[in-house]
């Protein structure tokens, strides 16, 4: 009998849970509710909320909107968004994750200090990611974004550096970047770094590795847009090369199933539990048919 197990630690982080709960609460009142960007980087969950009435809009559409109610998702927004909302009489339902909110405030405080010309504010994160855009917005676009260790090489090591991180990035690579900067920065300037990675995300790593290593086959469930999903999937592959990224039951490859004794189903912080359960049931049904 093949064992199919869902990782108990996988699924929405508390920031996403709060955003979805706020959306459902408003929609239950029968109001017209807009969401600025996909509420979560998972197309199935976005579709479920769309069926409930949630209207997803982009920033250009947001600028044209007046006298409406708009949900801001967990990723956070730059200050400009709040200014537009005030000008256009838009009521904001703010679901920005408290971890992201604290980070925005820290970066803004750093930026407001008088020695700005003498230092670089650096954010380790994904260029263009919603959270990163919100963080860079705290510095009126002055912060430097680096996506990986290689990009740290283009920093000016003759100027002081203040390093922060997107909340969902890899802790291991963050520390590699810290060590690289320490080795290369001029002794005449200062380097301060702040591990601002969400602990709920970071703490998933060891448990996820253990889960992936304990099964013959892993199906990692995540939306293709999820930054966190890509990172966690890579962690699975490191300990179990027989790990496969899917975002729906339709993507289960039948040819992988014969000869395995245990199958693990896990996912990102943007993956709903109901979707992992749906995929687990689909796997069991396919095994029965074989």
UniProtKB/Swiss-Prot annotation:
Binding-site positions, [4Fe-4S] cluster: 13, 97, 198
Record pathway: Isoprenoid biosynthesis; dimethylallyl diphosphate biosynthesis; dimethylallyl diphosphate from (2E)-4-hydroxy-3-methylbutenyl diphosphate: step 1/1; Isoprenoid biosynthesis; isopentenyl diphosphate biosynthesis via DXP pathway; isopentenyl diphosphate from 1-deoxy-D-xylulose 5-phosphate: step 6/6
InterPro entries: LytB/IspH
GO molecular function, one term: 4 iron, 4 sulfur cluster binding
GO biological processes: dimethylallyl diphosphate biosynthetic process; isopentenyl diphosphate biosynthetic process, methylerythritol 4-phosphate pathway; terpenoid biosynthetic process
Bridged cysteine pairs (disulfide): none
Cofactor section: [4Fe-4S] cluster
Keywords: 4Fe-4S, Iron, Iron-sulfur, Isoprene biosynthesis, Metal-binding, Oxidoreductase
EC number: 1.17.7.4
This protein's record includes keyword DNA repair: no
Binding site for dimethylallyl diphosphate: 41, 75, 129, 226-228, 270
Domain of life: Bacteria
Catalytic activity: isopentenyl diphosphate + 2 oxidized [2Fe-2S]-[ferredoxin] + H2O = (2E)-4-hydroxy-3-methylbut-2-enyl diphosphate + 2 reduced [2Fe-2S]-[ferredoxin] + 2 H(+); dimethylallyl diphosphate + 2 oxidized [2Fe-2S]-[ferredoxin] + H2O = (2E)-4-hydroxy-3-methylbut-2-enyl diphosphate + 2 reduced [2Fe-2S]-[ferredoxin] + 2 H(+)
Positions of the catalytic residues: 131 (proton donor)
Binding-site positions, isopentenyl diphosphate: 41, 75, 129, 226-228, 270
Gene3D superfamilies reported in the protein's UniProt record: 3.40.50.11270, 4-hydroxy-3-methylbut-2-enyl diphosphate reductase, catalytic domain
Cofactor mode of binding and number, as noted: Binds 1 [4Fe-4S] cluster per subunit.
UniProt-annotated binding residues for (2E)-4-hydroxy-3-methylbut-2-enyl diphosphate: 41, 75, 129, 167, 226-228, 270
CDD domains, sorted: lytB_ispH
HAMAP family reported in the protein's UniProt record: IspH
Family: Belongs to the IspH family.
Function: Catalyzes the conversion of 1-hydroxy-2-methyl-2-(E)-butenyl 4-diphosphate (HMBPP) into a mixture of isopentenyl diphosphate (IPP) and dimethylallyl diphosphate (DMAPP). Acts in the terminal step of the DOXP/MEP pathway for isoprenoid precursor biosynthesis.
Protein's name according to its UniProt entry: 4-hydroxy-3-methylbut-2-enyl diphosphate reductase
Species per Swiss-Prot/TrEMBL record: Bacteroides fragilis (strain ATCC 25285 / DSM 2151 / CCUG 4856 / JCM 11019 / LMG 10263 / NCTC 9343 / Onslow / VPI 2553 / EN-2)
